Amino acid sequence: MSVLKRLESTHGRFFNRHDINSKKTSGVKWKNVLASKEKGGLRVSSLYALNRGLMFKWVWRFYTQNNSLWAKVIKAIHGDDGKVGKKTKSVFPSIWIDIVHEMESLKNQDIDILKCMKFKIGNGEHTSFWDEVWRGDITFKNLYPRLYALESCKDIVVASKLAHPCLDHSFRRAPRSGVEQEQFIALINQVQSVSLVPCRDRRVWSLEGSGEFSVASVRKLIDDKMLPEVSSKTRWVKAIPIKVNVHPWKVRLDYLPTRFNISRRGMDINFISCPICDNGVESTSHLFFSCQIVKDIVRKIVRWCDFSFMELSSYEEWVVWLSNLRLSSKLKSVLEKVFYVMWWHIWSFRNKKIFGSKNTHMATIFEDVVSRSFYWCRFRCKASFSWIDWLKNPLLVSL
């Protein structure tokens, strides 16, 4: 686990562009980055979930490749069930038992990966009627405990059980009235539509439509259970680079190291005023929405796109404004790309101005937004519009 934590730490430092020995504070909680986009994160996915997915791949193989040499060795040492799903202690070091323990640990956190393995019944000759999950989401021995207590052949297979016209043929006595009779009727109703076919029973993975196991599905299951709900669903535009998509995500959640955010964390800085306009505190909302110079750039963009300008003071207001525009979803996507590129260039200009870079001219930002957004929309979308068409109005191009 300590190795995994170090790897996660390195992963986080790389994301925040921190040196491995750096003591800089991070404005972004790593768990929020790992969370899925549906939960407001970036869906980087945790190494913890990946590691468990790779572990469980061996459990899947243990069941689906049970005639392989390694599976036979596991059965010879730990029994036919391999101790999977059981609480067990090992008196000697065992990688297999460590994997079993991890599955049990996840189950204690309400993540029962074994439940995702289902039986697809063929001839029913290799599936336990009571011990396997082959009908519904729970074993019959747990769903109908009173009937299981009456069963004289606990390891009876589905084919043998359904071969007789009545399900109580292998019971030591007939079910009596009350709970036993209620469970017996429910069992009959649950299996009466089952039809056996002349093919071998096989295990299927319920998290994939193909029925085949995938590490990615386990990874997603664990992350969805263990990672936090950050905010509303993350907006993502496929036509622009990842780094440009991440930037608006930081704008929305106020994760950027603006002067106001830095001072709020207790760090002493000489100025907290906006480095672009020198008028007002440099907060995220001011830098990208309230700054007068940024507003001038936005006015140029709305004139270019041929619609009216509206005063906005936050990311949330911008989302509402965009959603209320009477444009098709494709054109809204184009406009969203343009704004994402604009915010990216504003942040880049701000950093160059603070850290003394030369050739920082505010007048070039609009030109950079037009050219860069054209390049990404034209070539990353594989569209066919021309540079001249884009210059006239990006909302009139054909994607």
Predicted regions: what they are:
Residues 1-399:
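A helix-boundary/hinge signal
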